Amino acid sequence: MSVGFIGAGQLACALARGFTAAGVLSAHKIIASSPEMDLPTVSALRKMGVNLTRSNKDTVRHSDVLFLAVKPHIIPFILDEIGADVQERHIVVSCAAGVTISSVEKKLMAFQPAPKVIRCMTNTPVVVREGATVYATGTHALVEDGKLLEQLMSSVGFCTEVEEDLIDAITGLSGSGPAYAFMALDALADGGVKMGVPRRLAVRLGAQALLGAAKMLLDSEDHPGQLKDNVCSPGGATIHALHFLESGGFRSLLINAVEASCIRTRELQSMADQEKVSPAALKKTLLDRVKLESPTVSTLAPPSSGKLLTRNPAQGSKRE
């Protein structure tokens, strides 16, 4: 089995690094396409041994599982470009925020009657095999197709199937979640520095506190509130700190952040469905198209079947 990424940005780089680190795929069975070959992420993929090309069509031809790892407003253009090259063997996995299964299927059905589409939302901690991924299968995807993606994504963290109508909310929760954690960690470190702790040590201790708290929660059946209470002694420093957080609306800020991300995801969905693109984004898209028309620079390995993950496209049953 081979995996392709349309787009060679942060997500593609994180997934490729995670898959190779987990041992489920060797780098030569991964291909990524990008109109720009001087990006830091492209350099990182090259160092891993991943095949690189400027041609999205090459990526489709040399892959079985195809990740659409580009911005939502680019998806319609990409599907128009590669639709004729998508075959029955392909599992098309959309990772773009807000882009629905039906919108991808509608585009691809102009080229073939039963495209296998899966919508996926993951996050950047896949790079250290601690990602959080959910997926929903499309009309024509087989049960085995979903299980194959789940097996692949479970190698880089937690993965589970959900109904598609939950994915926008999950984008705001775990998709954007690492950014909330990094901002919180940055602020915790600032607090430590303010009180005299060296920056490097403050960052390390703050990160370890978040890591340890997450592990305690995942390894127990206790409610987060109970674990929080266990840290607070009567009249102690922690309860005074929590009072300060509560008075500043800490909980409401996090709730509102998840809501804001979810709402924006739905706005992106509407823009993608209507193929609305901002002038700046349109200019970049046109420039990328010009680059794609230039001679292809690629280092391609022939598609081959992997030993760890296999599937037979002739078998399986469609989801009801």
Curated annotation (Swiss-Prot):
Source organism superkingdom: Eukaryota
Region (Disordered): 293-320
Any one GO MF annotation of this record: pyrroline-5-carboxylate reductase activity
GO cellular component terms, A-Z: mitochondrion
SUPFAM superfamilies in the cross-refs: 6-phosphogluconate dehydrogenase C-terminal domain-like, NAD(P)-binding Rossmann-fold domains
Secretion signal, residue range per the UniProt entry: none
Record-listed NADPH binding positions: 8, 10-11, 34, 36, 56, 70-71, 97, 230
Residue list for modification Phosphoserine: 304
Pfam families (alphabetical): F420_oxidored, P5CR_dimer
PROSITE patterns named among the record's database cross-references: P5CR
Compartment annotation: Cytoplasm; Mitochondrion
Residue(s) carrying N-acetylserine: 2
Residues given in the record as NADP(+) binding sites: 6-11, 34, 56, 69-72, 95-97
InterPro entries: 6-PGluconate_DH-like_C_sf, NAD(P)-bd_dom_sf, P5C_Rdtase_cat_N, P5CR-like_CS, P5CR_dimer, Pyrroline-COOH_reductase
GO biological process, one term: proline biosynthetic process
Sites where the protein binds L-proline: 164, 237-238
EC number in record: 1.5.1.2
Enzyme class: oxidoreductase
Complex and partners: Homodecamer; composed of 5 homodimers. Interacts with LTO1.
Entry's family note: Belongs to the pyrroline-5-carboxylate reductase family.
Protein name: Pyrroline-5-carboxylate reductase 2
Organism: Rattus norvegicus
Taxonomy of the source species: Eukaryota, Metazoa, Chordata, Craniata, Vertebrata
Gene: Pycr2
